[in-house]
Amino acid sequence: KLGNTINKMFKFEFVIKLPMIIKFRLMRLYHEKILFKFLPKESVFTSIWRNNYWGNAESLSGPGSTLVQTEGLRKKIPEILREYEVKTIFDAPCGDLNWMSSLLEDASFKYIGGDIVKDIVDKNDLNFGKDNIDFIQFDITADPFPEADLWLCRAALYHLSNSDIVLSLERFLESNVKYILTSNCITDDEHVN
């Protein structure tokens, strides 16, 4: 009931008309201070994805998932796979595959994409699933990791609380995954747990 009331207060149509900096601060407040405290992570991230709260026209996964933002990474990943002899990538959270889909076109590796949002998993499976490409609903803070050589965890951890980051890293350490490739966002001077 509280979630419905809060959702009515922060209607997307209202937020979209605000200046960008105010919009992002309101969305951050809404998700980090209100939703994350009262709703399951799956509900929060499903709401973010369905309503395009990141406000990006190219990718529902947000501005960090655009082709421009990932250009260097897309060039570097094949080198990393060769250097570390990676045969299976576990990409979680995988998001909408906006940038990753180009690496999967002629993939010589096995790819497992995991995301907490079931709609994303279903859509990715329909559009990209094949013999060497699988998708699973997955919570990086709670679920046991599948067998893989590399966990790709890009632009995700800073959306979680410090305790959830620790849980994610504990799940990784409990797994047989050899390597982690992750990123963080250090541009937010106002971050609080």
What are these regions (language model features)?
Residues 2-148, 160-193:
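Class I (Rossmann-like) S-adenosyl-L-methionine-dependent methyltransferase catalytic domain
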Residues 152:
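A conserved beta-strand element that flanks and buttresses the S-adenosyl-L-methionine
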Residues 156:
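Hydrophobic adenine-recognition pocket in adenosine-nucleotide-binding enzymes
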